[in-house]
A protein has these predicted regions:
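An N-terminal amphipathic alpha-helical segment
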Residues: 1-28
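Glycine-rich repeat segments that build the extracellular carbohydrate-interaction surface of secreted
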Residues: 30-36
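C-terminal edge-of-domain segments
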Residues: 54-76
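Helix N-cap motif at beta-to-alpha junctions
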Residues: 38-40, 75-76
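Long, contiguous binding/interaction regions
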Residues: 26, 30, 49, 60-62
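Generic cytosolic/nucleocytoplasmic N-terminal low-complexity/intrinsically disordered segments
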Residues: 1, 44, 52, 73-74
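Amphipathic alpha-helical interaction surfaces in cytosolic regulatory modules
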Residues: 15-21, 39-57
Length: 76
């Protein structure tokens, strides 16, 4: 399982998220992505983004006051 920190990107996480899934993960591999909560708009957007790409969202939870994590399985 890999862990990727997207917090430095603030709200602009989706391009990097897609790049990491494509290039850094193997099919059926699970990874944890951490990003900054901000105004909470990235939380539902991240769920929709993962599902629209055909990947499986295993978990989505608040990590602390400022950060959120999603656990994703890459599609085969």
């Amino acid at each position: 399982m890999k862990r990727f920190d997207l917090r430095p990107l603030k709200a602009d996480i989706f391009e990097r998220l897609e790049e990491l899934i494509k290039k850094e993960m193997q099919p059926n591999e699970v990874a944890i992505f951490m990003f900054e909560v901000g105004d909470f708009s990235n939380i539902p957007k991240s769920v929709e983004f993962i599902q629209s790409k055909g990947h499986e969202l295993l978990n989505s939870l608040r990590f602390n006051q400022a950060d959120w994590t999603i656990v994703v399985r890459k599609k085969a």
